């Protein structure tokens, strides 16, 4: 279970689960400024610096922050390097997923819990593509307003679906123009770990009901960290943050649901009308040259996510 969550909690970009979108955007911004980036997100830095989510996430934009952390704690620095590399690899993986989907003729996209995802703006979508973004109303409003005020326009027909995924989001999606008879490419990135196990099953059940043959779904699975190890890392990060002077406004780990009976996403999809495959995130990081050898828990497969892709039979 999660100690900071309730069944009806809500958030904006500066609180609770909303702040995790800022964290991920900060990692994308850092990767974008690398000499040979895996991904390019020209809007990530803007979305971070205007969020007001706290100095911790903005500090991640500092190119010298890793060296400062390393001077205090090498293991925490390795984790920071890993987190940045992981987010770059994850983004690259799902960017490729969408490129493959539109190459196959799919023109209807749904990004679940989209947060500060800027794919509707930064990817080169074919004419006639509609991108639906589902998230909390205040999160969607912050992103669209910030980008519009800075002259950024979508590269597809972007439609906001301001609804909590614990509510009747299929009805809200249809009301926004979604056509359940058309093939769709769905994405659940950075989402499943913030859902209880039964809500994860329900989410994929509803996706299946809205997906004709040839539709696709991609997901990042929820990692499973041992409680003792999680607490050790929490204490180390707090010590480093205190030394550097960062205020920790939220404990991301406490926002996640740890359910030992959570279904394996690949197995569940294969048993419910999909053809699913997965690449373990550590394999993807090695393949793309972003693996950090001394990262904590490197020998624990369950501590890292899978990237799953499936097609509706």
UniProtKB/Swiss-Prot annotation:
Protein name stated in the entry: Putative S-adenosyl-L-methionine-dependent methyltransferase MAP_3564
A Gene Ontology biological process term: methylation
Gene Ontology MF: a single term: methyltransferase activity
Keyword Transferase: yes
Domain of life: Bacteria
Entries under Gene3D superfamilies matching the protein: Vaccinia Virus protein VP39
Keyword Thylakoid assigned: no
Keyword tags: Methyltransferase, S-adenosyl-L-methionine, Transferase
This enzyme's EC code(s): 2.1.1.-
Role summary: Exhibits S-adenosyl-L-methionine-dependent methyltransferase activity.
Family statement drawn from the similarity comment of this UniProt entry: Belongs to the UPF0677 family.
Binding site for S-adenosyl-L-methionine: 135, 164-165
């Amino acid at each position: 279970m999660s100690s900071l969550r309730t069944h009806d909690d809500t958030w904006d970009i500066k609180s609770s689960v909303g702040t995790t979108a800022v964290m991920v955007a900060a990692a994308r911004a850092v990767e974008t400024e690398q000499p040979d980036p895996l991904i390019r997100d020209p809007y990530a830095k803007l979305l971070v610096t205007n969020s007001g989510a706290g100095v911790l996430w903005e500090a991640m934009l500092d190119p010298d922050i890793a060296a400062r952390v390393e001077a205090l704690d090498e293991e925490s620095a390795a984790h920071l390097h890993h987190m940045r590399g992981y987010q770059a690899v994850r983004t690259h993986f799902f960017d490729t997923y969408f490129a493959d989907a539109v190459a196959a003729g799919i023109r209807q996209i749904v990004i679940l819990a989209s947060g500060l995802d800027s794919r509707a703006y930064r990817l080169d979508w074919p004419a006639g593509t509609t991108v639906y973004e589902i998230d909390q109303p205040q999160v969607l409003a912050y992103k669209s307003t910030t980008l519009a005020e800075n002259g950024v326009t979508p590269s597809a027909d972007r439609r906001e679906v301001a609804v909590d995924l614990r509510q009747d989001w299929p009805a809200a999606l249809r009301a926004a123009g979604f056509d359940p008879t058309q093939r769709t490419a769905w994405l659940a990135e950075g989402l499943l770990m913030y859902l209880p196990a039964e809500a994860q099953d329900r989410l994929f059940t509803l996706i299946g009901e809205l997906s004709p043959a040839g539709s696709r779904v991609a997901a990042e699975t929820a990692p499973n960290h041992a409680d003792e190890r999680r607490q050790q890392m929490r204490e180390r990060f707090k010590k480093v943050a205190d030394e550097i002077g960062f205020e920790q406004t939220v404990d991301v780990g406490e926002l996640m649901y740890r359910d030992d009976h959570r279904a394996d996403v690949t197995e569940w999809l294969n048993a419910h009308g999909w053809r699913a495959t997965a690449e373990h995130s550590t394999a993807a990081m090695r393949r793309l040259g972003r693996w950090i050898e001394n990262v904590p828990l490197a020998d624990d497969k369950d501590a890292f996510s899978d990237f799953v892709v499936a097609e509706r039979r």
